[in-house]
Amino acid sequence: MNKSVGFILLLLMFTNTMNAELANGKIEEFFIKNGIEERKIRIYYPNNNSVDDDTTFIIMNDGEELFLERDSWRGRTWRIDKSFDGLAKINKDPNVIIIAVQSAKKYKGKFFDNTRRYLELFPKEVIEFLPEGNKKKIYGSLADTDYPKFLVESVVPFVEGKFEINLDKNNLGIIGSSMGGLSALNTIIEYPDEFGFAGCLSTHWIGIKPWEYLLLPIRQRISGDQ
């Protein structure tokens, strides 16, 4: 059997098994070239939704943390399929499609390296403002990937081609947590015409002292907060 055909069959079997374990909806898996690597992308259809002109697409960072617990290094995930299942039980059916992008920490799907994830999601524009020293040199030498650019130039065109649609700020958003939340904010700042909203949960605010986290809830809100 041709190796490519065998791989595709194996991927289909795995995806079917995964879908059987979801509380709601279905998933399709794809791999997109990212430099010398391939990045796993999962397209999640809540309630098996079809796509139309009113569908909102949401890119979610750290795709391995969104569904089944076995995909996560810590054995706990968001289980967004259960959240959508809860909405379905109260007759709520959001017209959305989730684009789950696997993080760089799951290197080649074999082991976890959180340093790679941190460096990829770290806003590269900040490096030039760091004080001169070892930290600036290390970040400058290792932070060689541009995650927002990868999303806009690789992931978004792939999704547009698959669904034969145009994505922009009117139908595309991005969500992440911790460093993924910081990256989501950075992405919408860099590409305001591409993304219409960003969800930043438990954001990892780099550059502040640990005790300053305690003051964040009572500080002045960012313009636009409700």
PLM regions with names:
Residues 16-20:
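Sec/Tat signal peptide C-region and signal peptidase I cleavage site
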Residues 21-226:
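Non-catalytic cap/lid and distal C-terminal segments of serine-dependent acyl enzymes
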Residues 14-15, 226:
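Accessory, usually C-terminal, subdomains that scaffold auxiliary metal cofactors
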Residues 4-14:
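Sec-dependent N-terminal signal peptides
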